[in-house]
Amino acid sequence: MSFNKLKFGATIGIIGGGQLGKMMAQSAQKMGYKVVVLDPSEDCPCRYVAHEFIQAKYDDEKALNQLGQKCDVITYEFENISAQQLKLLCEKYNIPQGYQAIQLLQDRLTEKETLKSAGTKVVPFISVKESTDIDKAIETLGYPFIVKTRFGGYDGKGQVLINNEKDLQEGFKLIETSECVAEKYLNIKKEVSLTVTRGNNNQITFFPLQENEHRNQILFKTIVPARIDKTAEAKEQVNKIIQSIHFIGTFTVEFFIDSNNQLYVNEIAPRPHNSGHYSIEACDYSQFDTHILAVTGQSLPNSIELLKPAVMMNLLGKDLDLLENEFNEHPEWHLHIYGKSERKDSRKMGHMTVLTNDVNQTEQDMYAKFEGSN
């Protein structure tokens, strides 16, 4: 796909004013673009860095058209906008990311089927539409397995682990509320992710392979480069995905590595991703920089240089008191506080990145600081 390059001073619209929208806006502004953001929250983080703010729900057709009329290009920071609404916008306005990826990825079953058809390695799964399908899941997958809702859910929401017959009731409860997908539970050795930007004329730029750790289904930390030799294999899997899903901009593919060292595609995030935040300080281009380059039709860098290894830590509400006490003693901490008005213990309130020559030691230091609050 090829489209005209946006000139400096043009206006970029962002659907979604959370931290991802804020960091997109900051990258856009340093490149000379104006930013208009649409978000239902009057005090969303992006509002305070955007040139203009439209407060409206994501399904407000009048407001979305207002955004389109004000902007030369539109992008979005998350995948929870209506795919049908996005399709209608794409017919009238310049939205390089398109709607196709959103349409596929909002449905976990369609996502799994698309990944499998693309030739990537995915965890065995089956569709679960009603409670009687659980018997088929037990027969096909065996214990343990995970039941996930087909639609919605993030940071571990909308899923239950079925270890044995005693857990089946929780699975039945979930199926009563939504159609689901059942997946074989893996004995996971490591989680990694690969952030990629696809630009004008199908130019592809890869970031370093990222090693991730989750706590309570929320990303806890990312280490770059990943301490496992899976980069070539991950790139091979991503290239298969790129051939199957239309998308322009930055996206991330999450992988599981099991106890047999097998790499499985877990899911795709069709936008900049939490595990790529380290790139703001640790790389010559951040994931937000390359996203803006892509959606404005600019050329991408041929490769991304990792300037220094890094450890990125998510900061939840419960971490902020500790952070305030420690921050002045650690000038090596690159701190990002998102500006969310409501603080909750398990809500992502910011992140910090530490550039280091010894990621193992830095990881231990971070554990010593934050282990007690997690």
From Swiss-Prot:
Its EC number is 6.3.4.18. Coiled coil: none annotated. It catalyses: 5-amino-1-(5-phospho-beta-D-ribosyl)imidazole + hydrogencarbonate + ATP = 5-carboxyamino-1-(5-phospho-D-ribosyl)imidazole + ADP + phosphate + 2 H(+). Belongs to the PurK/PurT family. GO terms for biological process: 'de novo' IMP biosynthetic process. One of its GO terms (molecular function) is phosphoribosylaminoimidazole carboxylase activity. InterPro entries: ATP-grasp, ATP-grasp_carboxylate-amine, ATP_grasp_subdomain_1, PreATP-grasp_dom_sf, PurK, PurK_C, PurT/PurK_preATP-grasp, Rudment_hybrid_motif. The lineage of its organism: Bacteria, Bacillati, Bacillota, Bacilli, Bacillales. The gene is purK. It is an enzyme of class 6 (ligase). This is N5-carboxyaminoimidazole ribonucleotide synthase.
